[in-house]
């Protein structure tokens, strides 16, 4: 499934927004987080692990109607358990098994909360629904989760496109998979002084994708020769039960060395979600499980005081960048 607008991948914040100060940096240069991927290309599914090098404060907002998640209550502001790793995967709710492998890998490396009896890692996870693109019976499991986590101890691999959790991602599914297009996982990062900010997006939406007001991927006509319109299709089905299943979901994670409380991080995640609304039409539907995390990485002594509003505004722009990257980096199918 080939995007009709085959522009090059987004090259950084300067390509898509006019914000003075921030400069684009590689996601791999972010301090405090390491990325590992494992995928089954034949089954078109996979796992991406974001391992924090120090336990981090985190928060999450769920904006879609059908999330598949693990341990999100443990990072609620009123609980504030330090996070050790975030997992994105395919497989829908079946894919949650991958976190068991991540937790076991972290335990093997002595990472987690020491209860005095055992080390217990805090691992959050969210999944996309990719069962309709590849194999519905082969899903991410504990073995894949362990391997993806293990990779973070020897390398740092934030590749874009059809890798890890983005292997089976698609967009524009208002008329089903036959008129959908391929997407994947995308990244964008920026630095202002000593403040670093990066966004990862696994793009697997019901809706169409826009960049700078132009549609770049989404629902196609039945003969796949041009774009159709998911928004109009949704309106035309207003009296029908269009959303018969929650077979989509876009995931995002904001990583920053900014010194924010869990409550502030939740607000940061909400501000970052504006990037979804700008790029995905329609967004946050009952057919999606859209979920956004915000995580403060690195040791507390190294965190940077920063304006929540400024970081939130920039995170929304970087979310737009990461969404475009997820489209332009996707393989042609």
Task: Locate the predicted segments by residue.
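A structural signal for small-residue-enriched, beta-sheet-centric alpha/beta enzyme cores
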Residues: 2-93, 97, 108-333
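Active-site-adjacent structural elements in enzyme catalytic domains
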Residues: 101-106
């Amino acid at each position: 499934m080939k995007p009709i607008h085959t522009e090059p991948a987004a090259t950084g914040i300067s390509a898509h927004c006019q914000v003075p100060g921030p400069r684009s940096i590689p996601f791999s240069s972010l301090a405090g987080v390491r990325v590992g991927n494992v995928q089954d290309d034949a089954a078109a599914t996979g796992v991406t692990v974001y391992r924090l090098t120090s336990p981090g404060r985190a928060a999450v907002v769920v904006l879609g109607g059908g999330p598949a998640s693990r341990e999100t209550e443990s990072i609620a502001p009123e609980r504030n358990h330090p996070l050790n790793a975030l997992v994105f995967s395919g497989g829908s709710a079946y894919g949650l098994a991958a976190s068991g492998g991540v937790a076991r890998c972290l335990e093997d490396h002595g990472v987690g909360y020491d209860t005095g009896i055992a080390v217990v890692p805090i691992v959050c996870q969210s999944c996309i629904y990719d069962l309709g693109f590849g194999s519905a019976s082969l899903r991410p499991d504990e073995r894949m989760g362990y391997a993806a986590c293990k990779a973070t101890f020897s390398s740092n691999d934030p590749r874009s496109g059809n890798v890890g959790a983005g292997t089976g991602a698609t967009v524009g599914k208002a008329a089903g998979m036959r008129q959908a297009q391929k997407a994947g996982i995308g990244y964008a990062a920026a630095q202002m002084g000593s403040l670093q900010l990066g966004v990862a997006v696994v793009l697997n939406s019901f809706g169409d994708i826009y960049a700078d007001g132009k549609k770049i991927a989404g629902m196609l006509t039945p003969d796949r020769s041009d774009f159709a319109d998911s928004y109009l299709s949704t309106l035309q089905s207003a009296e029908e039960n269009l959303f018969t299943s929650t077979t989509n979901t876009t995931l995002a994670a904001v990583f920053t060395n900014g010194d924010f409380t869990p409550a502030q991080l939740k607000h940061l995640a909400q501000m970052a979600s504006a990037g979804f609304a700008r790029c995905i039409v329609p967004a946050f539907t009952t057919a999606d499980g859209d979920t956004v995390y915000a995580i403060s990485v690195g040791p507390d002594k190294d965190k940077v005081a920063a304006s929540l509003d400024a970081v939130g505004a920039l995170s929304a722009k970087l979310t737009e960048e990461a969404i475009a990257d997820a489209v332009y980096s996707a393989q042609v199918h």
